[in-house]
From Swiss-Prot:
Gene expressing this chain: rpsQ
Subunit structure: Part of the 30S ribosomal subunit.
Superkingdom to which the source organism belongs: Bacteria
Described function: One of the primary rRNA binding proteins, it binds specifically to the 5'-end of 16S ribosomal RNA.
GO biological process, one term: translation
Record-annotated disulphide pairs: none
Protein name: Small ribosomal subunit protein uS17
Record keywords, A-Z: Ribonucleoprotein, Ribosomal protein, RNA-binding, rRNA-binding
GO cellular component, one term: cytosolic small ribosomal subunit
Amino acid sequence: MPKRIMKGVVVSAKQDKTAIVRVERTFTHPMLKKIVRKTNKYHAHDENNVAVEGQTIAIRECAPKSKLKRWEVVAEEGTEA
């Protein structure tokens, strides 16, 4: 089974080897027929501490690394000022 990959913005990179990433998705509400934006925050494993707050990164699903971490940082996209 392929691993899911998502893109999101780093909200916090204060913890050692951990980045909290906000991922936003849009969908059409089934009853209201309006476009709805939903955000989720994921704890991602950042082995080399490369993530910076405000940066857009890609995260990939992985085996559990701790109580909350089930994702790992794959690639950096760039920074948003």
